[in-house]
Amino acid sequence: MIRVRAGERRITVSGHAGHAPAGQDIVCAAVSALMYALAGYLEETEQAARSDIRRGYADIEGAGDCGAAFALVRCGMEQLAAAYPGCVEIIGS
């Protein structure tokens, strides 16, 4: 299961969805795409405070006026959690 902890300017994800074999899991791919897009956007707009993305784990923190970007990613994660129960869990804020 992928666990997502999302705040206004920080989001951490860990784990694996277990929806399909490694390299074929669309849920893991979707979560990764959201996290890479957020990291890229924050870097491009010079709002990245810190990012750590590796296999099975990502932790991204923003600076400045980046709340909308984090809200967008959280919304995407919530939609994945609803579409794939048992694969993605949103934990607190």
Model segments located where?
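N-terminal intrinsically disordered, cationic/polar leader segments
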Residues: 1-26, 35-93
